[in-house]
């Protein structure tokens, strides 16, 4: 998963606090700083990267060989940064190394540090022309996260997307707060998956009695065309629409998906599924729109209540899938035109959007195995 850290600006406290607060509000909770550790820790539940011994991740290289404060020795066997990083790592501490790529010798310093630290921050005056990909390739087999220092969203995009391998994360050195928000939005877009939704034809729809159904209330507002992928079969999940439309019976609840009964699968991050009954406050689910674009959302509450259910069966190119939904006018699927349609108005021959996955599932993970669901 790609990530971003913030390098706190070297300025007076009130301005620094504004940048850190903006980062936290944008979901960036790893802060690199060398001067105000105590005050920063009071701003929220964050991870501090600092040379201080009480830091969550200890930083080496600032005021050392990594940033040019100390000259590199003739042989890296006598490198102060490598020695410090090795000692900290051996003592069980998480370590981040900071290296400005000033020369071939600094490239080699970065490679050596990448073999002993948890995180390696790479910095260059114009880092796009340094051999970043070579360093990435050399360290691919190592258990280290590579981070490129960037000033704006364009540099972040190159680091995370354009390079053949790309870095694991970026260290933001922003000139203004808008750059923090732009990079946070870029990360969300990079991490989002696209699901290929197919128009499946309804072959059967009928009431079947009562059962325990699950409403998933998220911490996000969903728009028209958005919902969750839910189904009785892991190999075929229906796009169940959010309660984002007004009804003559109830007010809209755009944070909610009335998803189905307790045994149904729901798509969650990482290409996994979970049972609806497993979800609880703080879990993550995937919100998908009618074009298959996705984003993650936090579960704020799950409500399980006994309600009348109906069976929906659909078929696409010989693949037949089913799901159960509450039998109510406010429960909607999404038709092949991308429009929400109430289950009370659906009939045989109508087409709705379904995500098909030929993989079998074991504890929610996709596996290559033959499985029959019916």
Swiss-Prot record:
Q: What's the protein name?
A: 3-dehydroquinate synthase
| Job of this protein | Catalyzes the oxidative deamination and cyclization of 2-amino-3,7-dideoxy-D-threo-hept-6-ulosonic acid (ADH) to yield 3-dehydroquinate (DHQ), which is fed into the canonical shikimic pathway of aromatic amino acid biosynthesis.
| One Pfam family matching this protein | DHQS
A Gene Ontology MF term for this entry? NAD binding
Please verify whether the record's keywords include NAD.
Answer: yes
> Has UniProt tagged this entry with the keyword Signal?
no
Which family does this protein fall into? Belongs to the archaeal-type DHQ synthase family.
Q: What is its EC number?
A: 1.4.1.24
């Amino acid at each position: 998963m790609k990530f971003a850290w913030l390098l706190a600006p070297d300025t007076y406290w009130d301005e620094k606090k504004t940048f850190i607060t903006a980062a936290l509000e944008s979901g960036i909770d790893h802060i690199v700083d060398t001067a105000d550790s105590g005050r920063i820790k009071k701003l929220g539940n964050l991870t501090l990267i600092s040379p201080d011994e009480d830091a969550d991740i200890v930083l080496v290289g600032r005021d050392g060989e990594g940033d040019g404060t100390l000259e590199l020795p003739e042989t890296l066997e006598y490198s102060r940064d490598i020695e410090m990083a090795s000692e900290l790592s051996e003592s069980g501490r998480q370590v981040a190394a900071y290296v400005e790529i000033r020369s071939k010798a600094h490239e080699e310093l970065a490679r050596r540090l990448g073999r002993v630290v948890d995180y390696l921050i790479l910095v260059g005056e114009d880092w796009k022309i340094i051999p970043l990909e070579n360093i990435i390739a050399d360290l691919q087999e190592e258990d280290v996260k590579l981070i490129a220092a960037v000033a704006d969203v364009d540099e972040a995009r190159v680091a995370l997307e354009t390079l053949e391998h790309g870095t694991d994360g970026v260290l933001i050195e922003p000139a203004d707060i808008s750059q923090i928000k732009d990079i946070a939005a870029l990360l969300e877009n990079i991490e989002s998956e696209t699901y290929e939704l197919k128009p499946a034809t309804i072959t059967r729809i009928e009431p079947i009695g009562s059962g325990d159904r699950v409403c998933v209330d998220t911490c996000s507002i969903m728009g028209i065309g958005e919902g969750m992928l839910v189904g009785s079969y892991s190999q075929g999940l229906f796009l169940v629409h959010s309660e984002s439309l007004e009804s003559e019976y109830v007010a809209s609840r755009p944070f909610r998906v009335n998803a189905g009964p307790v045994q149904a699968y729901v798509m969650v991050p990482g290409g996994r599924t979970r049972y609806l009954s497993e979800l609880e406050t703080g879990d993550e689910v995937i919100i998908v729109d009618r074009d298959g674009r996705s984003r993650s959302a936090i579960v704020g509450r799950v409500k399980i209540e006994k309600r009348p259910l109906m069976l929906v069966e659909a078929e696409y190119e010989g693949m037949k899938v089913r799901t159960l939904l509450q039998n109510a006018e406010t429960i909607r699927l999404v038709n092949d035109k991308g429009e929400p349609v109430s289950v009370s108005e659906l009939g045989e021959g109508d087409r709705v959007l379904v995500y098909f996955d030929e993989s079998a599932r074991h504890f929610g993970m996709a596996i290559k195995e033959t499985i029959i669901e019916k």
